[in-house]
Swiss-Prot record:
Cofactor(s) for this UniProt protein: Zn(2+)
Functional note: Thiolesterase that catalyzes the hydrolysis of S-D-lactoyl-glutathione to form glutathione and D-lactic acid.
Name of this protein: Hydroxyacylglutathione hydrolase
A GO biological process held by the record: methylglyoxal catabolic process to D-lactate via S-lactoyl-glutathione
The protein's Enzyme Commission number: 3.1.2.6
First-level EC class: hydrolase
Native species: Pseudomonas putida (strain W619)
NCBIfam families: GSH_gloB
Top-level division of the source organism's lineage: Bacteria
Pathway named in the protein's UniProt entry: Secondary metabolite metabolism; methylglyoxal degradation; (R)-lactate from methylglyoxal: step 2/2
Pfam families: HAGH_C, Lactamase_B
Subunit structure: Monomer.
Length: 259
């Protein structure tokens, strides 16, 4: 049994803290800043940080790794095809890594960065996905390094995970993502309801995560490239027909980049 909590960092990052309460051991995902993790460990001195899991190389995800490694000796696991500080275990598609007693499958999800990975496990009572900056709540990451031909299939793969899978992404972008989702599907009742729910949460400065794969299928335009109305909006934006899922995705992403 693990407990998952968010440690806020910077303006909108979340460092995910996985806790094995029985054994007083923990792991963190994407510690862009060491300070929130250090503060938690100081407040919980009988706990041990055993593992640091990294999804990609951007500094807001790895900036705290070196300090935490020095302080705790935690094992650092991250993508094999990217430069990750202090990495002990290089991970690629098909690998597995165990942290706090939970075994995670490593999924290659290129697009945001070329070597980006995600961590999925169906061992907990509810399956969990740590998606980094690939899949966001109601959105997806920008393609800083990859192509639509890489990222759309990566997102479709995540969308095929069990619908009750909890999605732990790395940023609090949900409300702005839903504003875009409303522009794409202004009559989608699931989008409208989620927008209202998230607006209330953010008004109280509350976290909007985790999401679920099921909710993303209903409300995330980047997972809905097969929906007729989504394609129509993408066609309107580009001024021509987008004949493939990749083309629809690329149109949506370019629209979102300027939204």
């Amino acid at each position: 049994m693990i407990q998952i909590d968010a440690l806020p960092a910077f303006s909108d990052n979340y460092i995910w803290l996985l806790q094995d309460t029985a054994k007083r051991r923990c792991a963190v995902v994407d510690p862009g800043d060491a300070a929130p993790v250090e503060a938690w460990l100081a407040a919980n001195p009988d706990w041990v940080l055993e593992d640091i899991l990294v999804t990609h190389h951007h500094n807001d995800h790895v900036g705290g790794v070196e300090r935490l490694k020095k302080l705790t000796g935690a094992r650092v696991s991250g993508p094999a095809n990217e430069r990750i500080p202090c990495r002990d275990l290089a991970l690629d598609e098909g690998d597995e890594v165990t942290a706090v007693g939970v075994t995670f499958q490593v999924l290659a999800v290129p697009g945001h960065t070329l070597g980006h990975i995600a961590f999925f496990s169906d061992q907990p009572a509810t399956p969990v996905l740590f998606s980094g900056d690939t899949l966001f709540a109601a959105g997806c990451g920008r393609m800083f390094e990859g192509t639509p031909e890489q990222m759309q299939p990566a997102l479709a793969r995540l969308a095929s995970l069990p619908e009750r899978t909890e999605v732990y992404c790395a940023h609090e972008y949900t409300l702005s993502n839903l504003r875009f989702a409303k522009a794409v599907e202004p009559q989608n009742p699931h989008v409208l309801q989620r927008f209202d729910d998230v607006t209330r949460l953010r008004a109280d400065n509350r976290i909007t995560l985790p999401s679920t794969i099921g909710l993303e299928r209903l409300t995330n335009p980047f997972l809905r490239t097969s929906a007729t109305l989504v394609k129509q909006k993408a066609d309107e934006w580009k001024g021509h027909s987008n004949t493939t899922h990749v083309a629809v995705f690329a149109a949506l992403r370019s629209w979102k980049d300027t939204f």
